[in-house]
Amino acid sequence: MYIQLLCFFLFLFLLLQATMSKRSFKKFVEQELGSLPHFLIYTVLEWSLIVFLFIDGVIAFLSNQFAKFFDLNIPCLLCTRIDHILVPRDPQFYYNESICDSHKKKVSSLAYCHVHKKLSEIKHMCEGCLLSFATEKDSDCDTYKSLIGILHKDLELLIDDERDLPLAFKKDDNLVQTTKNLVDYKTNNIKNDSLKQHCSCCGELLKIKSEKLPKNNNSFLAPAPSPRVSHNKLSENESEFKDMDVDRTPSFVRGGNKFFGIPLSDSAQNSPRWSVRSLKKSVLNKTENASDTTDPTGESILNQLKKEVRLDKKSLIDLYMELDEERSASAVAANEAMAMITRLQAEKAAVQMEALQYQRMMDEQAEYDQEALQSMSSELAKREEEMKELEAEFEVYREKYGCLTDQEDAREEFHKQNGNASAYDDCQETKPVSDLAVSSSNQQENGENIDQNGQSKRSEESTAENVVSADEEKGSESKEGIVKELSEITERLSTLQSNGDLLKHIADVLDVSEGEAILLQISQNLHMLRSFVAMPSESMNL
């Protein structure tokens, strides 16, 4: 324990000395302490570093196993380092100084496949995995050429223009030997099929570059291609392209989902139609080259095959571009479809909630209306009972006081007499004063009539009092109406009494005969009025 503390303090002392002298720790130890202390100190430091790395490796292994066991993402070796947070450094430090030379060589020979998400050896990758990064924005042909050059392809097949090599006509004697060479070449290709390599990323077979035919100074003559045969081949290829055009992905997926309004490609050259046109052009170039070679030899056939391979590679690049474009289009369309589905589900849930709310409100309104109907039906039943009670009371009063036909006849007679009285008053106004003197003889008779009228007035007042006493026996519900009618009747009686006093005064002033006639008429009118006033009180009692 003491030895460890002593070593630790010694290390701190040496470190402080090195920092103060502005020299590195290694140079400080070599210059100040010598070679033996330098060896011992660095041995201890290396062993301590080994221990730290062992602990770090064990922790990293446990973290990886923990992530695999619980199906978590395995942590990255470079992202999990915290020294780039604690000590800011250049990002190149982690790739140049933190990695040894052997691993740098291995990493530099690897390429990333965007399709399979793997790092694989670039020399054994197929073109599909190698060109998986090709997108609409990154469509540089030079990049493809360089990548194919890394794959040990022949760059001259992709860079050089089509050119016809000069062919020489030789004798027919060399034809047999060239055919033998072709047969040997085919047998060698058949043997090499068993030695084909697989892609280090996806595992597919790699297209190995074909070996060149053994050159021979002796050339041969080959028959010129028939124009009919080339024309038939061209028509077959065109029919194949038509089938490809029919089986192609629909334009709304490739050019953008018109329903969602998302453009997916801006250039017309990246479209599948352009690729099919390029394929057609390549086939036409093949047929033209085949027709132009009038004197082919073995080398000319190889050149034609190389040109075909070059055109096929170009068409493959276009097809890869089309495939990547359609993949991106399908991914965007799927994302938009999922977004629309989620939006429709949210709208559906909102509509369902609103419908439930309206249904609840309608149920509450229906309950409220039902309660109102029940209350109205109960009130109607009460009113019917009251009507029945009133009808029973009406029958009782009818049996007690009789019908009202006599009272109606009296009302009609009263109206007729009122009309006669008004006519009589008009006639009295037109009479001369001499006629009044003639009727003075009847003054005594009129006085007697006045006495009789007074007696009739008393009898009518007594009948009115009887009516009032009968009305007081009614219930509390009709008292207010009866009181009002009685007040009106008393007012009318007071006015009639005042009119009677006025008539008496007029009779005293006027002649006896005329006054008696007027008083008689007035007494009749008062009698009719009293009978008319008595009728509504009786009707109220009924």
From Swiss-Prot:
Signal peptide: 1-21
Compositional bias ranges of the Basic and acidic residues kind: 471-480
Listed PROSITE patterns: GTD_BINDING
Disulfide cross-links: none
GO cellular component: membrane
InterPro entries membership: GTD-bd, MYOB
Region entry Disordered, spans: 219-239, 419-480
Transmembrane segments: 39-59
Polar residues: bias regions: 437-456
Keyword Transmembrane: yes
Protein location: Membrane
Pfam families, A to Z: Zein-binding
A GO molecular-function descriptor: myosin XI tail binding
Membrane topology summary: Single-pass membrane protein
Key words, A-Z: Membrane, Signal, Transmembrane, Transmembrane helix
Stretches assigned to the GTD-binding domain: 300-398
Reported function: Probable membrane-anchored myosin receptors.
Protein name: Probable myosin-binding protein 6
Organism: Arabidopsis thaliana (Mouse-ear cress)
Gene behind the chain: MYOB6
